Amino acid sequence: MKKIIHKAASRGYADHGWLKSYHTFSFASYQNSERMNFGMLRVLNDDVVQPEMGFGTHPHRNMEIISIPISGALSHKDSIGNKRSIEVGEVQVMSAGTGLKHSEFNDSKIDAVNFLQLWIIPEIENITPYYNQKIFEALERKNKFQVLVSPKDRRVGGSLSINQQGYISMIDLDKGFEIAYDLRNGAYFFLIEGEVLIEDENLEKRDAIGIIEKDKVYIKANKSSKLLVIDVPMI
């Protein structure tokens, strides 16, 4: 087994006024040669967008982009005809492929939006861009792994599909609950809330651990916790 630990305080940080962003991996002005990626996971940003602010229209190409709201709602528009709102409990997937443009905006006059954005390197380049989003019921992840995203050729249940052999799961853990996660590739465990013990490493809010070369990973919740698991090829 090999593991890498990323404490919350070790992340890059940028304060643009309208946007406060924590970067797990090198992104924009935050550049760290030892924090470029975890396998095919290239970006994990923890963003807070202020009321009535947002990301103007900008392009992407050949990247799988997954957004997961933690609080608040974002209005989405893109160049392939989608105009949607994405809220807590939903997951959004964009496969940028040959290229698309999009914007994300916080329409609220009062509340900030906190969301996670993940970029995963695609398996096949220059595919036709596509977009999807879905509501995932919280009860389906209570003390069990709920698969949010899976490969388009090996889709799991009602999960959203991406152009990569990657899986993204979420679990809401009760205090004291123990569970094992079966690795498909390498897995990056990002703790959204709470406190957990993973392979003898104590993780608190926004801490993370990446694990490879192991079949099962053992998890125990020291507090009620919300855990995101990003399982991706390492090469």
Task: Go through the PLM ranges and name each one.
Residues 1-235:
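Jelly-roll (double-stranded beta-helix
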